[in-house]
From Swiss-Prot:
<dbReference type="GO" id="GO:0004820">
    <property type="term" value="F:glycine-tRNA ligase activity"/>
</dbReference>
<dbReference type="InterPro" id="IPR006194">
    <property type="entry name" value="Gly-tRNA-synth_heterodimer"/>
</dbReference>
<keyword id="KW-0963">Cytoplasm</keyword>
<keyword id="KW-0648">Protein biosynthesis</keyword>
<keyword id="KW-0547">Nucleotide-binding</keyword>
<dbReference type="GO" id="GO:0004814">
    <property type="term" value="F:arginine-tRNA ligase activity"/>
</dbReference>
<comment type="subunit">
    <text>Tetramer of two alpha and two beta subunits.</text>
</comment>
<dbReference type="GO" id="GO:0005524">
    <property type="term" value="F:ATP binding"/>
</dbReference>
<keyword id="KW-0030">Aminoacyl-tRNA synthetase</keyword>
<protein>
    <recommendedName>
        <fullName>Glycine--tRNA ligase beta subunit</fullName>
        <ecNumber>6.1.1.14</ecNumber>
    </recommendedName>
</protein>
<dbReference type="GO" id="GO:0006420">
    <property type="term" value="P:arginyl-tRNA aminoacylation"/>
</dbReference>
<comment type="similarity">
    <text>Belongs to the class-II aminoacyl-tRNA synthetase family.</text>
</comment>
<dbReference type="Pfam" id="PF05746">
    <property type="entry name" value="DALR_1"/>
</dbReference>
<dbReference type="Pfam" id="PF02092">
    <property type="entry name" value="tRNA_synt_2f"/>
</dbReference>
<keyword id="KW-0067">ATP-binding</keyword>
<dbReference type="InterPro" id="IPR015944">
    <property type="entry name" value="Gly-tRNA-synth_bsu"/>
</dbReference>
<keyword id="KW-0436">Ligase</keyword>
Length: 679
């Protein structure tokens, strides 16, 4: 008869950002534990609040399934001695399986007999197996962990309670310094310790103590309450998904309310107000029906609506202090001069091993000038790029960015406009940070895109040059994100800038502040980001073939990968790739100094292939270029069918290899076709 299992771990307040992934991890690890221990189940439901992680298993088998395993041992000729008795090898084999030689039988495998034994293991009661379930809790991993009291172990937060129930029976287990029971803790202020009656009564038992254990239910409550406020007040509330997820992991019993602030603060830039409310106070932003910011906010209390007016006043008071700071910095920063702030950047460290921000900007300016030419920017855009590169970090020394660092670039744009800078320059100051997250928004202007590329390129080359190279998951300077941004920007704008040649040219530059180094590592790092950009939807062999193409032009590489994926589902893909692969492999033996000499052709097939290669222009889209190369497949096959490439005559052999080398030099602009798998 099946049963229901409940496991709850009660902890000190968890950081909001770890609650959801930890809840998911607990469910996945328990499912793995049960499967590996042959305990079948129907369903797993997970729960979480800031002070607990829990999981309930429904339809859990009351006993393990029996296990029958066959084990293959040594060959019969080794298992028996000259007298036909079992050898030490056979005896040792069965002993290792906990059996005797009586269990041995011989089975034929591919014409030879081998020792086989069959081991039967009766399933244990679920209750006995579950005594080892604490290994699930011990195996959990967290971004950070801590020690407490005098304990030698560490965990995400101190553990206070452990509840393990099989239906209504409490299992006795020990985890860290806690002995399990059926006592859980209610809401920190509104509830008390409570007894969990059974696995099925878990949510109801906690609800009576003002705890909503199901995160999805808490989220629904928050959204419904906000919608009710919208309807009652005639407003729109920005229900930001990330903020919603954070807030629901800060509360156990949510109650939403709306507060207000003086409308005078609306004269401060909207970004400052939104940052103050959303990022610093975890408030939802309120707008009117036209989308204009209103002097209101919505917050979520961890509790009921008792004395809610006092709660509203307290939150308003805290927010006003933030808004006062914002208003002050907005007013005072406008008194500053951009030139003065830029001059002070010589005293601001970019990194102690690399130099100052001013030096970083100087290098960025040189790189930006080179990129502007490669991207064919207009004269006006080139001028804007140069001016932006001279000043684009000035806002880091403003009071506003010092207080609200999330506004770097955003305030730079606003202050630059107020100072009379060209609109393109001001926009570029904001856009150079983009994209600021995986999948984040990209620069919309060419000037901003070039500045963003230049800034990211110098950052990448500078850190690599001093040996600060990401390893494993460790990337403290966000170089992967910066490089992914480079790849995305190049693809978005369709700039056909050969990255290998560009990086070579940057390494030829000379700066007093820094000498670029570790070029090979930089190129491999960029290739890895292009590989990631192609994504798992592109098979590994296609990604590798494209990454080995002769032209490191990001938009073309990504387009080639897409074209190859589509072509791989067509009938002519396999024969075309196989003929090209054969040509690629043979071309590796060619003498690079040998030029094709048509006077050495001995058959029409040589002449036909050479003419086809000469006429191969690789024009149009990646798909069209691939079609042009694939169209050569019959000509290539005809050449191989009628021509001995590796002829004994050295001149003929070299000439024929040179023909194939010419083919490869053109086709490799798309991909290294011999890296493609057709099996």
């Amino acid at each position: 008869m099946s049963k229901n299992l409940l496991i709850e771990l009660g902890l000190e307040e968890l950081p909001a950002y770890v609650v959801t992934p930890s809840e998911k991890q607990l469910g996945e690890r328990l499912a793995t534990f049960l499967t590996e221990n042959r305990l079948s189940f129907e369903d797993i439901q997970t729960f979480s609040t800031p002070r607990r992680l829990a999981v309930r298993v429904s339809g859990l088998a009351d006993q393990q399934t029996d296990l029958t395993e066959d084990f293959k041992g040594p060959a019969k000729k080794i298992a028996l001695d000259a007298d036909g008795n079992f050898s030490k090898a056979a005896q040792g084999f069965v002993r290792g399986k906990g059996l005797t030689t009586d269990a041995i039988e011989f089975r034929e495998v591919k014409g030879e007999e081998y020792v086989y034994v069959t081991k039967h293991e009766a399933g244990k009661p679920a209750k006995e197996v579950l005594l080892g379930v604490t290994e699930v809790l011990s195996a959990m991993t967290f971004p950070v962990s801590m020690h407490w009291a005098n304990n030698s172990f560490e965990y995400i937060r101190p553990v206070h309670t452990l509840t393990v129930l099989l239906n209504d029976e409490a299992l006795e287990l020990d985890f860290l310094d806690i002995h399990s029971g059926r006592v859980s803790r209610g809401h920190r202020f509104l509830g008390t310790e409570t007894t969990i009656t059974s696995a099925d009564s878990y949510e109801a038992d906690l609800r009576s103590q003002f705890v909503i254990a199901d995160a999805k239910e808490r989220q629904e409550m928050i959204v419904e309450q906000i919608k009710a406020i919208e309807a009652a007040q005639g407003v729109q509330v920005d229900i930001d998904a990330d903020l919603l997820n954070e807030v629901l992991n800060l509360v156990e019993f949510p109650t939403a309310f709306m507060g207000s602030f003086d409308a005078k603060y609306l004269d401060v830039p909207e970004e400052v107000l939104v940052t103050s409310m959303k990022n610093h106070q975890r408030y939802f932003v309120v707008r009117d029906q036209e989308g204009h910011l209103m002097p209101n906010f919505v917050s979520v209390r961890n509790g009921n609506d008792q004395a809610i007016e006092n709660v509203i006043k307290g939150n308003e008071k805290v927010l006003v202090a933030r808004l006062e700071d914002g208003e002050f910095f907005w007013r005072e920063d406008q008194k500053l001069q951009i030139a003065d702030l830029v001059a002070k950047l010589t005293n601001v460290t970019f990194h102690e091993k690399i130099g100052s921000l001013a030096e970083h900007m100087d290098r960025t300016r040189v790189i930006a000038a080179s990129l502007a030419k490669e991207a064919n920017l207009s004269a006006e855009e080139v001028t804007a790029v140069d001016r932006a590169a001279q000043i684009y970090k000035f806002d880091l020394l403003t009071g506003m960015v010092g207080e609200f660092d999330e506004l770097q670039g955003i305030m730079g744009e606003k202050y630059a406009r107020l100072a009379g800078e060209d609109a393109a320059v001001a926009t570029a100051i904001r856009e150079h940070y983009l994209p600021d997250a995986a999948g984040g928004a990209l620069p919309e202007t060419k000037v901003g895109a070039v500045l963003a590329l230049a800034d990211k390129l110098d950052t990448l080359l500078s850190f690599f040059s001093v040996g600060l190279i990401p390893s494993g998951s460790n990337d403290p300077y966000a170089l992967r994100r910066a490089t992914q941004g480079i790849v995305r920007i190049l693809d978005h704008f369709g700039w056909r800038i050969p990255m290998d040649k560009l990086v070579d040219s940057l390494y030829d530059l000379s700066f007093d502040s820094l000498t670029y180094a570790n070029k090979a590592d930089v190129m491999n790092f960029i290739r890895a980001r292009v590989d990631k950009m192609m994504g798992k939807a592109v098979p590994k062999d296609i990604r590798e073939a494209v990454l080995e193409s002769s032209t490191f032009v990001v938009p073309e590489m990504l387009a080639a990968a897409e074209a190859l994926v589509k072509a791989s589902h067509t009938e002519n893909y396999k024969p075309a790739v196989e003929s090209l692969s054969r040509a690629f492999n043979l071309a590796e033996k060619a003498d690079a100094s040998v030029q094709v000499d048509p006077s050495l052709f001995e058959n029409e097939q040589e002449n036909t292939l050479f003419a086809a290669i000469q006429g191969l222009t690789l024009a149009g889209s990646a798909a069209q270029q691939l079609e042009q190369v694939f169209a050569l497949s019959p000509v290539i096959n005809d050449f191989f069918d009628n021509t001995m490439v590796m002829a004994e005559d050295q001149a003929l052999k070299n000439n024929r290899l040179a023909i194939l080398s010419d083919l490869v030099s053109k086709a490799k602009a798309i991909a290294a076709f011999n890296q493609l798998n057709t099996k």
